[in-house]
């Protein structure tokens, strides 16, 4: 019986390690970032938003320093992001973004990127901004479970 348990534990450990080693972080970063950027384009659609959200767990935790310091995972985290991001679809008249660098390790990715935008607020006034940010993503089963954005 002990030998059977040891064999099962070894198979489970080997399978988890093999699955983790097979994850294509490079492809994930490129696809995730492209999907994120598409949600900010002047012609962004609900389909673009849904494609981006497909990279996230349903209970995503989302934190933007310094304004939103809570990274708690919420059962309706993805639904909350959908609601929040839907308000901003198509508000940009111009949006540019570029990855500066990225790194990854077991179930984690950091993406340093720069982005700039111009657009119109709902009151008709113009806005523009340019930022460099570091996004740290914690992955679970190949999806983003917690994201933290560090920027000024």
Report residues per predicted region.
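A solvent-exposed, acidic/Ser-Thr-rich amphipathic alpha-helical stretch
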Residues: 23-26, 49-102
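A beta-strand edge to alpha-helix "cap/lid" segment located at domain peripheries
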Residues: 21-24, 82-152
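Positively charged n-region of N-terminal signal peptides that target proteins for export
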Residues: 1-4
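Short, solvent-exposed loop/turn segments that connect beta-strands within catalytic domains
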Residues: 41-46, 68-69, 122-126
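Short regulatory "switch" loops immediately downstream of catalytic or recognition motifs
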Residues: 33-41, 62-67, 117-120
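Residues that line or immediately flank small-molecule/substrate-binding pockets and catalytic motifs
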Residues: 8, 64, 151
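Short, low-complexity N-terminal intrinsically disordered segments enriched in polar/charged residues
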Residues: 9-12, 16-55
